[in-house]
């Protein structure tokens, strides 16, 4: 991944987070929503935006529907203040890395506690 794409990933992550905090008025998108990562494709036409909710994935489908419906708004607002040739289309994806990490830690703890002592 090029240095430019890495910088844009960080910039878009910060911008989308700020827009979620200050501009979006959708009740499905509350302050417990977290933008974990942005991954722009090499041709810079698409970007996966990985999000999670601190309360878990109970309303995952509603949240993703609201975010993907607002993807054009995010793209337009970020394009206004960013000078790049191609503004990627944002695709919001549920980030399972935190849940996977918690599950892995639980499994490790179970193995440690069930080992016979020498």
Swiss-Prot record:
Keywords assigned: Cytoplasm, Ribosome biogenesis
Lineage: superkingdom: Bacteria
A Pfam match: RBFA
Localization of this protein: Cytoplasm
Swiss-Prot/TrEMBL GO biological process terms: maturation of SSU-rRNA
Keyword Cell membrane attributed: no
GO cellular component labels: cytosol
Entry keyword Cytoplasm: yes
Main localization of the protein described in the UniProt heading: cytoplasm
GO molecular function, one term: ribosomal small subunit binding
Complex formation: Monomer. Binds 30S ribosomal subunits, but not 50S ribosomal subunits or 70S ribosomes.
Classification via HAMAP family: RbfA
NCBIfam families, sorted: rbfA
Known function: One of several proteins that assist in the late maturation steps of the functional core of the 30S ribosomal subunit. Associates with free 30S ribosomal subunits (but not with 30S subunits that are part of 70S ribosomes or polysomes). Required for efficient processing of 16S rRNA. May interact with the 5'-terminal helix region of 16S rRNA.
Family affiliation: Belongs to the RbfA family.
Protein name per the record: Ribosome-binding factor A
Organism: Dehalococcoides mccartyi (strain ATCC BAA-2100 / JCM 16839 / KCTC 5957 / BAV1)
